[in-house]
Curated annotation (Swiss-Prot):
Domain of life per record: Bacteria
Descriptive protein name: GTPase Der
Binding locations of GTP 1: 9-16, 56-60, 119-122
GO biological process: ribosome biogenesis
SUPFAM superfamilies recorded: P-loop containing nucleoside triphosphate hydrolases
Reported function: GTPase that plays an essential role in the late steps of ribosome biogenesis.
HAMAP family in the cross-refs: GTPase_Der
Binding-site residues, GTP 2: 181-188, 228-232, 293-296
Domain KH-like residue range list: 350-433
Organism: Karelsulcia muelleri (strain GWSS)
Length: 433
């Protein structure tokens, strides 16, 4: 079982900076404004050959009436419950506050391995300022700088010293599935439904999710990483820097995933921004599954065909995409959509032998040849698949620059149909032979 280490503390003490420092890249958004991290953010670290899971939590507050602060507190408690080790991060530049005592009291009750981590010693080098934290009664104390890394090596050495060296994390080829869409279409609710618990904060306020959150899903014979992302708005509707970073992180999550589940709000329909997100996924050559969410509002199977046909007309010519009409409340077709996304991931990696490709595709092209141009007969000699991550095929012809777009789509559709590339963008190239 993978060991779990969580970073906790009041707002703006450097938790996300330390999280990014340990996992080795900027997965959490870092800003001087407090309250940026809301959900539990998961990352993975390999230190001295030992792997563990790291959780970044939102800044804990105990008296705020703000709805997000209350939800952050819930996420804080969830993180404590699932952790083996707790890093209590403090900032020596401020006096000890009542909230610090509250956090200390809560974590000490758990009887787990606790580290008091005094941050920002690159700025506040007076070691005597750290003695005030003896009041917490936490014996394992480390002074670090999450900005420049001072002291983090000793901290990590101590953390992993009691871990089993044989612990392993995710398989390297496990499918990564990004849950994407406009704000407030039900992305986090979908993940919480799959997990049967409140992993991510859900409210009726758009923009609740800011970081992209990785979640390991292993149920019903399915194993994959689900990535909950911030809602992607149009650029003109982005009102603050944090939201801009969140949208950029969401787009990055699409690029780093195998398949994207694009969630559409059934009530508002397939809007222009949904088309923009669809194009982002397609242009990055990622697999696509469409989820028409909140279908329980309609609960009308007679509408499905007309709704689906309308969407396929909008997304044409790439409309060979699985479409599911789902509801996070009734759980209709949710598992089926995840299974389809996983299947698409493995089909993305499919490599077709050149002999088989030519045996199946060339007879179709010979039966349906490209129209002649200015009396010139266009012939395709043979084809092969390029060794890239996403499916790309190269066709050798006597006039590569004269191939019409419609014929290119004809080839693409036949490859998709014959070799089960449903939901996968295919790139077709032509070269002179």
């Amino acid at each position: 079982m993978t060991k779990i280490v969580s970073i906790v503390g009041r707002p703006n003490v450097g938790k996300s900076t330390l999280f990014n420092r340990i996992i080795g890249y900027k997965k959490s958004i870092v800003n001087s404004k407090s309250g940026i991290t809301r959900d539990r953010n998961y990352g993975f670290c390999n230190w001295n050959g030992i792997e563990f899971c790291l959780i970044d939590t939102g800044g804990y507050t105990n008296e705020s009436k703000n709805i997000f602060d209350k939800k952050i507190c819930e996420q804080f408690l969830f993180a404590l419950a699932e952790s083996d080790v707790i890093l209590f991060l403090v900032d020596p530049s401020n006096d000890i506050l009542g909230i610090d005592y509250d956090i200390s009291k809560r974590i000490r009750k758990l009887k787990k391995s606790i580290y008091l981590v005094i941050n920002k010693i690159d700025i506040y080098k007076n070691i005597y300022n750290t003695y005030k934290y003896c009041k917490f009664g936490i014996t394992k104390t480390y002074c670090i700088s999450s900005i420049n890394g001072t002291g983090t090596e000793k901290l990590l050495d101590s953390i992993v010293s009691n871990f089993d060296k044989n612990i392993k994390i995710y398989k390297k080829n496990i499918p990564r599935i990004a849950i994407v869409g406009r704000p407030n279409v039900g992305k986090s609710t979908l993940i919480n439904t799959l997990l049967n618990k409140n992993k991510n904060i859900v409210t009726n306020i758009s923009g609740t999710t800011r970081d992209s959150i990785d979640v390991l899903y292993s149920k019903f014979g399915i194993e994959c990483i689900l990535v909950d992302t911030a809602g992607i708005r149009k650029k003109k509707n982005i009102k603050e820097d944090i939201e801009f970073y969140s949208v950029m992180r969401a787009i990055k999550s699409i690029q780093n995933s195998d398949v994207s589940l694009l969630i559409i709000d059934s009530k508002s329909g397939f809007e222009s921004q949904d088309i923009n997100i669809f194009k982002i996924i397609e242009n990055n050559n990622k697999g696509i599954v469409l989820l028409i969410n909140k279908w329980d509002i309609f609960n009308n199977n007679y509408l499905i065909n007309s709704y689906e046909n309308k969407i396929k007309k909008i997304i044409a010519p790439f409309n060979d995409v699985p479409i599911f009409f789902t509801s996070s409340f009734t759980k209709k077709d949710i598992i089926k959509s995840i299974k389809t996304a996983v299947k698409i991931t493995f089909n993305l990696r499919l490599r077709i032998k050149t002999s088989l490709l030519n045996k199946i595709i060339l007879p179709i092209l010979n039966k349906n040849p490209h129209p002649s141009i200015n009396g010139k007969l266009i012939t395709i000699k043979y084809c092969s698949q390029i060794q890239t991550y996403n499916p790309q095929f190269i066709f050798f012809t006597n006039y590569p620059n004269n191939i019409k777009e419609s014929y290119k789509r004809f080839i693409e559709n036949n490859i998709r149909e014959k070799f089960n590339f449903t939901g996968i963008p295919i790139k077709i190239l032509f070269r002179l032979k």
